[in-house]
Amino acid sequence: MKKLSLAVFNTQPPHLYFGGVERRIVETAKRLLSKVDTRVYCGTKAGFKKTALVNGITFVPCFSTDALFPLDNWFFNKTLSRAVDAIKADVYEAHTVSGYGFLKALRKRKILKPFIQTIHGVLADEYAQSFRGDSPTFRAKLANLIMWQLSRIEGESAKNATLIVTVSKYSSEKIVQFYGVDKAKIRIVTNGVDTQKFRPAQDLGEIKHQIGISNKQCVLFVGRLIPRKGLPFLVEAAKHIVKERSETAFVVVGNGPLKNHLISYLEKINLSGSFVFLGDVNEGMLAALYNCADVFVFPSIQEGLGIVLLEAQATAKPVVAFDVGGVHEAMLDKETGLLVKPDSRELADVILRLLSDRSLRERMGRKGRVFVSSNFSWDVCAQRMLQVYREALGDIA
């Protein structure tokens, strides 16, 4: 059978960034190399200027900007809208709102090509939830306001797409609720995790020493530093935690518009010595950091699924998260971790409970790895996406 040609659109270059969306693109494409010729069209960020071939996947730069989301996305889509004749494929797939410019140009010219919109977190839902937490910086407030406009674009793209893929039942319901899309167009394909890369490891003293947390218990957060990810809740919880367990280190992986505000606030409340901000890290370092953690905390106030929850559980770590969105689909409450309502004091209480009970941490960690290994596989994700591509083409067997 002839290989299917697929054009994927994503603002961030997946071979240079290690966010959940980017990992999904790479892991899926790697597993479909024999059946799908994937070309990923992505923004010119992090110095990405020339077409690259990595692990059999072609990455093509399209002019954007190094500015933060959503400005980078706007420039990227402007570039794509002018490239309809240049980008040829059997099927097109856009992640989040990274391809609306291309889709709009296709429809305007009445070119009926299969177009799949993959929605990870529903932007209209994200906007609705964004005012539950603080948005203390001008840039964060501006991003929330622009999110409203982007949610309208996402809704329009969802209506015009051939099929919609999303990562959880929760997100599927929100797409119907906010965008009025026919449920029959939606396919749920959950994210996966590479349980060989993310697995329990021992002897991580060197890593802990390297980041300055030797002989301390580690509470780990991984995610973008934006209001939706809820890091201010963890900062407030830390006030209570350090009173009872002063030798606790809070390690933060990721970047975003809240970073400088959070650092300033921690200095103001004399907690800067308890927090370590590492910025973005590569996949190998990320796996090591999961293993350094005693507890993984995910205080997001809106989430489609939460791939970092899967990775933490794959490394046999207990997870703590807010009971919002599709988070409950990514973990087992009271078995692989603990769910609480969005409240900093409740968050502090369950973190303290886990920090003080090693046997509970180990028991939940073991169950977490079994849960993820049994239910979240990139192999399954890739095969289901292949079915979606073929369905969009109309030739599914």
Where are these regions (language model features)?
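Short hydrophobic beta-strand element within catalytic cores of glycosyltransferases
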Residues: 309, 318-321, 331
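Short alpha-helical donor nucleotide-sugar binding micro-motif in glycosyltransferases
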Residues: 280-281, 288-293
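Acceptor-binding helix/loop patch of EC 2.4 sugar-transfer enzymes
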Residues: 110-155, 196
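Conserved acidic donor-binding segment of nucleotide-sugar-dependent glycosyltransferases
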Residues: 333-334, 338-345, 353-359
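Carbohydrate-associated surface elements
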Residues: 170, 192
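Nucleotide-activated donor-binding/catalytic signature segment of Leloir-type glycosyltransferases, i.e.
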Residues: 263-281
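Aromatic "clamp/platform" in nucleotide-sugar-dependent glycosyltransferases that forms part
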Residues: 301
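A conserved mid-protein helix/loop that constitutes part of the nucleotide-sugar donor-binding site
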Residues: 23, 27, 217-240, 250, ...
